[in-house]
Amino acid sequence: MNDFYHVLIKNDGSIIHDVFATSHKDLICKYITPADDSKSYFRAMYSPKMDCRLDDLDNYQIIISENYIPDWFQGSLAEDITVKLREVIESMIVRGHKQLLLHDGAILVGTAVVQELKQSIVFAMYDHARIKSLDKNSEIHHVTDECIIEEMHDSTKIEELSGFAKVNTMFDYSKIIKMWGQSKVNIMNDNSRIAMLKGDANIISMHDEAQADRMKHMSKVDEMHGHSVIEEMWDWTIVEKMFDQSRINYMDEESKVCEMFGDSMIEVMCGNAIVEKLCENSLVRKLHDAAQILQKELE
């Protein structure tokens, strides 16, 4: 993770950091006063080495974000700061049960269980970690392995869902930026949104005004209901069934819809896109290239 973890290291051995800081500028604006000499501190990242997990404390390194290394950062002072930085990350790691994380930053590992997350950040979830309720604008940067989030509410966000990770239900304006691997979302409700599905990512059912912006590779949606929308389908993506007034705006390449019912609609089909069966009042507005509808059973 390129943005983990911003710190300012001071010449008195203290470390300035904040789990909600997204840049060194944030830390400087909040914690550095006009009385502080610019040479009394330096900007750095405390990050794991490439491809290492965030809980792998033995593989962290200090990456100095300056054009120079201060003369005072050496010897026992440098050693003490390294120990303190390790303790900062260690304090974030949750391995057991937590009833609530509030205004907090965490890394969930093993069989960790958090009942409720409010206005907090989870930098990563690994192994079999679980969150029951993600709420109040909380966010998770990376979810992988066989981790589970039971419910997403409010305007909560997951940046990346991968591996065999799963979200059971999305509500309100909750959002996932990218799904890949064999990750899964069971139910999307309200105005929930997924920006990108790749790999073998799967949505079981979409309802209400739920939306998926772009489907790639072999990702799949089992069922679309209500006024749910998919903006684009590419590659070998599949939608099994469309109902009600669900809509797909654009299909291309080898993408496929198996069955359409109710007043469901596809705006444009291009490439070799296919609808296997068009039923009831369902509609495809425009066909281009070799796109085709294989069977019609309209009312």
Regions found by a protein language model. Give the residues of each.
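Short, glycine-biased loop/turn motifs at secondary-structure junctions and
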Residues: 1-299
